[in-house]
Amino acid sequence: MKKLMMLKMQGLKKTIAKFAKKIEKMDPGSGKFGEFMDVVLDEMKGIAFDDVTRDGAGNIVGTVKGYGSGDAVVMISHVDVMPGSRHELEGLNARGMARFKYGVIANLYSAALIKRTLLPLTGDLVVCCVPRFECCDPGVKYLFDNFLKNRTNKIKGVVLCEPTGFNVNIGHKGRMEYEIVVKGKLKKNFLENRGMNMLGTMFPLISELEKVSKDLPNNVNMGRSGLRIKDVLYRGYNARDDMNEFRVVVDRIFVPDESEGAILTKAKTIARKVYSSESEITVRTMLSKERLKTHTGLEMVSEKEFKPWIMESHKPFAVESLKCLTENGFKSNFGFWRSIVTEGSYTCADLKIPTIGFGAGEEDDIYSGEEKFSLDKIERAVYGQSLIVQRNIGMPTFGWTSDSI
């Protein structure tokens, strides 16, 4: 099988290089997101998927049909959705977004390689390219609630086409944005509608949160949790009930040992303690929400959260995936992402589907600003992802496993 795959890989190199050149300088930001996804859709239609579609949320899905009715493997790559104002402010362009394009290219062409080998699969290979917002990932939820709704229990595993340095990654930290809402009669040294005075009232809470940020849990594989004050909002004074309200918006990174509920409860406890001397105070904590609109026009309201997740390394999908890589020249190990988030926050944390990550490039490359693609890395990612698919759902032929062919 290795020789067959390598032979077919040679035949794909020029096509991969052509597609890489086409999208290398494309910028999905500044209102051109739909144009970028159109190019991805057209490419998938041109490389012999058995079925290609785009759903209501803008997810592009291609299927390579298996010869049997066994469990499927789902491969997911993403494209970052960046609002125009943020995009221009931070100067993000094709350079800064290059590494997610590695995942898109390898995702499509690993399926193309599988098709060209003609090696049978026991179940379908489903290739998905999903839009991902900075604050949340509603696209992948829409995908599983709709296109994959009747197949969730028939998925052997999910492969996330993300930068792993060709390791098999099995988890990462979570990230969420939450609000602490304090409302009450802040009589002590407080004059309503005075900006400096309002900041002075909020400072004790901000100060306590800063103290907490210095003593957060650390995970030996994923790194330390984090806390950052994102915004402070004064919602004004209501003369009818003599109440003032302000909100502190917190950006929180958290390891799997922490829970969303415990984090929100602790934040509420801190705020109540800070304002314990004030009368008639109420404190609420909640996940922030954002109204989003996809390039297809679908509007959604989503909580601003990516959940942490870890998949046990002894799970067969993880074990077999790592084994097939090391048997075929990859110096792979199990690993974890330390700073990025992925669709595993939904597929593994919520749906409990075995999920791994594998791809070209290092995690830190996302922020490096490199302009040029490495075609060699892309080709290795295509080869490696194809090996993972074959090992997990390749159909034995004439008494041999697909690895023996």
Residues covered by each model-derived region:
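Metal-dependent amide/peptide-bond hydrolase catalytic core
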Residues: 1-4, 25, 29-32, 179-405
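Acidic/His- and Gly-rich active-site-bordering loop/insert found
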Residues: 2-97, 116, 120-121
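Short, surface-exposed alpha-helical segments at coil->helix boundaries
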Residues: 17, 34-38, 104, 264, ...
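Short glycine-aspartate micro-motif
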Residues: 72-74, 92, 154-160, 177-179, ...
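Short glycine-enriched loops at secondary-structure junctions
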Residues: 78-81, 163-166, 173-175, 235, ...
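Short, flexible, mixed-charge acidic loops at enzyme active sites
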Residues: 84-91, 173-175, 297-301
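Short, conserved micro-motifs enriched in small and acidic residues
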Residues: 92-105, 118, 134, 196-199, ...
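Acidic/histidine-rich catalytic neighborhood of metal-dependent amide-processing enzymes
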Residues: 101, 105-177
